[in-house]
């Protein structure tokens, strides 16, 4: 006998979900390309991309087909067995990057947890049990587990949970002298986002990343690139390290890797990977067939000249619209980022009001992000159409006008 479903509203969230999020007042129920519709049928243009996740937009036909096909074949085996989609995806990632080995997980946090554990374990077994220092950066974000949130340089996320993992040092981003001051032979790894996403869409300078590479080589430390947000085509290269010409020892990927399906990966060399053995790390769901089938389909589309080269043109269109908005309303002190990870910093008179612009955008029918209290962030689909860019930015301009009026 069928049971009538209880009506779901935004109030339901407050009744059943832990209060760790503050979601919008509307509930999206359908998406197609760069358009989203809520329960009331209102349409939005999506420049948030699920926080840089839906790299091919919503319900891309190739990803839907991959999900349906795999869903009718094999869902889950655990890592007591391997599976074909995981091996295919692993081969694609290795063939396209510096890496020789890959390990799949389910989220950016898990990929980074894996990377940090591997970096410390490698240093302990190859060098010294006292080689455990991790150097990371203020305003970084690497995840929400106790280890990853401690490596992230934001006390607002890491404080209040008791003792933190030890031997983690934070220094200013893009400050090579600060790194040199704390770098020594006890350092096992330097962990960096080539572009700090949550930290305000701040891109590393080429000199900074090259300097980190040299320091790591000098002190036999591993260079770890967290490309969870800036990887998988977001910058216009498949991974940001390719743009900089600086090769890390370990790289993490998530978000856009699955195009909306939860999956992540840690990539490294055979030499570093060999420090792990059976049982050193693991995941019940990591590399499951459903996730890897969808990620494989996403990879095949993103890693093409058509998509990657188009990102630079699309970025310029966004920047031109933001510049026009600034000329009209005088609200931005800086427009920055790389590819389709774009930050627009608010001028001092609008300091702390990024979420006001975000909410006004939603009211006007455009979904955008903030990166801290002072920066608007745009992370749209990598294949967003020009017409959607134009219309969405017109809506955002209307929203800005209402906030500053």
UniProtKB/Swiss-Prot annotation:
User: What is the activity's pH dependence per the UniProt entry?
Assistant: Optimum pH is 9.5. At pH 8.0, the activity is reduced by 50%.
A GO MF annotation of the entry reads: pyridoxal phosphate binding
SUPFAM superfamilies attached to this UniProt entry: PLP-dependent transferases
Its needed co-factors are: pyridoxal 5'-phosphate
List the PROSITE patterns hit by this protein, alphabetically: AA_TRANSFER_CLASS_3
Modes of activity regulation: Inhibited by gabaculine (Gcn).
Work out whether the entry's keyword set contains Cytoplasm.
Answer: yes
- UniProt binding sites for N(2)-acetyl-L-ornithine: 144, 283
A Pfam family that this protein carries is Aminotran_3
Record keyword Cytoplasm present: yes
- CDD domains (alphabetical): OAT_like (cd00610)
Under Enzyme Commission nomenclature, its number is 2.6.1.11, 2.6.1.17
UniProt keyword annotations, A-Z: Amino-acid biosynthesis, Aminotransferase, Arginine biosynthesis, Cytoplasm, Lysine biosynthesis, Pyridoxal phosphate, Transferase
| Localisation per UniProt entry | Cytoplasm
This enzyme catalyses: N(2)-acetyl-L-ornithine + 2-oxoglutarate = N-acetyl-L-glutamate 5-semialdehyde + L-glutamate; N-succinyl-(2S,6S)-2,6-diaminopimelate + 2-oxoglutarate = (S)-2-succinylamino-6-oxoheptanedioate + L-glutamate
Task: List, in alphabetical order, the GO biological process terms annotated in this UniProt record.
Answer: L-arginine biosynthetic process; lysine biosynthetic process via diaminopimelate
Q: Which residues carry this modification: N6-(pyridoxal phosphate)lysine?
A: 255
Q: How does it assemble?
A: Homodimer.
Q: What HAMAP family does the entry give?
A: ArgD_aminotrans_3
Q: What else is known?
A: The reaction catalyzed by ACOAT is highly reversible. This enzyme may also transaminate ornithine.
Alphabetical list of NCBIfam families matching this protein: arg_catab_astC, argD, PRK01278.1, PRK05093.1, PRK12381.1
The UniProt function text for this chain reads: Involved in both the arginine and lysine biosynthetic pathways.
- Under what name is this protein listed? Acetylornithine/succinyldiaminopimelate aminotransferase
């Amino acid at each position: 006998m069928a049971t009538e479903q209880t009506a779901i509203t935004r109030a339901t969230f407050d009744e059943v979900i832990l209060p760790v999020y503050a979601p919008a007042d509307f509930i999206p129920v359908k998406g197609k390309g760069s358009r989203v519709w809520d329960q009331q049928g209102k349409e939005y243009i999506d420049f948030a991309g699920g926080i840089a996740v839906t790299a091919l937009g919503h319900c891309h036909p190739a990803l839907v087909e991959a999900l349906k096909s795999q869903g009718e074949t094999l869902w889950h085996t655990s890592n007591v067995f391997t599976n074909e989609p995981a091996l295919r995806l692993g081969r694609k990632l290795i063939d396209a990057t510096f890496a020789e080995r890959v390990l799949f997980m389910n989220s950016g946090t898990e990929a980074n947890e894996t990377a940090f554990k591997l970096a410390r374990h490698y240093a302990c077994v190859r060098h010294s049990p006292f080689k455990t220092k991790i150097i990371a950066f203020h305003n970084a974000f690497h995840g929400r587990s106790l280890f990853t949130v401690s490596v992230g340089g934001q006390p607002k996320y890491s404080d209040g949970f008791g003792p933190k993992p030890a031997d983690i040092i934070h220094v200013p981003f893009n400050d090579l002298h600060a790194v040199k001051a704390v770098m020594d032979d006890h350092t096992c790894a330097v962990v960096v986002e080539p572009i700090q996403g949550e930290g305000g869409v701040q891109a590393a300078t080429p000199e900074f990343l090259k300097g980190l590479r040299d320091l790591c080589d000098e002190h036999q430390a591993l260079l770890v690139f967290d490309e969870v947000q800036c990887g998988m085509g977001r910058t216009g290269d498949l991974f940001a390290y390719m743009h900089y010409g600086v090769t890390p020892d370990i790289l993490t990927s998530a978000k856009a890797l699955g195009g909306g399906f939860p999956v992540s990966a840690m990539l490294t060399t055979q030499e570093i990977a060999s420090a792990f053995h059976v049982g050193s790390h693991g995941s019940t769901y990591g590399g499951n067939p459903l996730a890897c089938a969808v990620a494989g389909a996403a990879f095949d589309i993103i890693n093409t000249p058509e998509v990657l080269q188009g990102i630079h043109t699309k970025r310029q269109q966004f920047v031109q619209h933001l510049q026009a908005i600034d000329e009209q309303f005088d609200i931005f002190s800086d427009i920055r980022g790389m590819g389709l990870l774009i930050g627009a910093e608010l001028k001092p008179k609008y300091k702390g009001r990024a979420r006001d612009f975000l909410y006004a955008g939603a009211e006007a029918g455009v979904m955008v992000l903030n990166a801290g209290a002072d920066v608007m962030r745009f992370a749209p689909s990598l294949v967003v159409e020009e017409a959607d860019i134009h219309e969405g930015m017109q809506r955002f301009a209307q929203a800005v006008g209402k906030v500053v009026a």
